[in-house]
Amino acid sequence: MFFNIKLFENMITSTQKRLQNGDIMIKHIVNKIVAKGCAVILAAVTVGTTAFAGISLSGTEDFASIFGLNVVYGAPADTSSASSVDENGWPVAPEIVSGSAILIDADTGAILYDKDSHAISYPASTTKILTGLLTIENCSMDEIVTFSKEAANSVTWEDAQLGSKAGEEMTVEQVMYGMLLHSANEMAYALAEHVSGSLSAFTEMMNERAKELGALNTHFTNASGLHDLNHYTTAYDMAMIARGCYNNPKFVDIDSTYTTYTIPPTNKTTTARTFKHRHLMLKGRQYEYEYCKGGKTGFTDEAGCTLVTFAEKDDMRLICVCFKSDTNQRFIDTRNLFDWGFANFKKITTSGGDLSSLLTSDSYYDSRVFNQYNLDLNLNAATLTLPKDMSVGDVKIDLDNNYNPTSNNGIYTAKLNFTAKNNVVGMAALRISTPADLAASSNLP
């Protein structure tokens, strides 16, 4: 028998990487009541890549936008106080190493930081947060999951797994903990089959739900994030997906667990399975961050190191996504961006009158969009995320004259620009519908 030493070395290197990595627009609806013409206009704000301000409207519903072994501790950036500002009065963010990253406010959807966030990336195991969200939305935690032969055999010895066996039974909640904390790939497969009957049906559900959450360039082919050329997303899209997860209390309850979790013996094994969360910013871990509320790690050779993290301080909840990163650097980058975000931004609640004062007939009236209607527009009260030295008075709203309004079966769509201090902070897609359209919609308050 001949021993392939090169193959053995490659296997060891791959295993070390996996051990090392801990893993084997703003879009909100703005209701505007039209005094004449009995039309309702919906604005879905989609923040561009340089956007920082966000708006969260009370009494509204989101809809998809129409328009990814040796521990080395790095020194954090100095973010103990508010950082300097650029020539437009905008906070200057810390330098990071991750190739693609984004920092958003989980409540308003405001984009506080963006680095090539629309670049196509492989998400690796961060995919599992969407698998978890769909499971919570479609199952009870006490339902019994039976592992199929396909699910049990879907992993190799070097993949993250918990050794589940064909025919083994666990509760949905136990499988969720195994997937989100330990990153067990066969458990993601089993949940997909339990929810939808097959992996292919589940991935269709994943792609549809991702769009509903605001993803623009995402396509998933599996429930775990194992590499596939057609399994991709962007940091921006993953932040939108993570926002849906962070706003689900049951998801946060499971994902924020920093103590050990044990799956007791089952019908196929007499041995209990005990494990901890692989996210190293949780309490008691190497990169402990006191405001960390969970998240998900990921790694494949093709994706590099990936990371989704939730954090909360005072009244602000932030989400950070780092893709195309290194083993330890993703945690350092995330911590520095969180510190910078908490130090430099604030949330303010405004009255409808405050926002309505931004509207002028010149900004909104355009015969190409509204035809014969003479509009009287009103906005609900809102929460905004802005740099600490800015106010709602710094925000301007204008109709984009370079965008030609489009029509789809009599429903017109136009575009607004939101700016502050000469920065384009957002874009709004205006949809105009008739009273019949309004009556048919169950999503409107």
Show the residue positions of the predicted features.
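Gram-positive cell-envelope targeting signals
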Residues: 1-62, 445
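Membrane-proximal envelope biogenesis segments
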Residues: 46, 58-83, 89, 106, ...
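Active-site-adjacent loops and short helices of periplasmic peptidoglycan-processing enzymes
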Residues: 53-236, 240-249
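Domain-terminus/edge residues, biased toward the C-terminal soluble/receptor-binding domains
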Residues: 215-216, 229-232, 236-237, 242-445
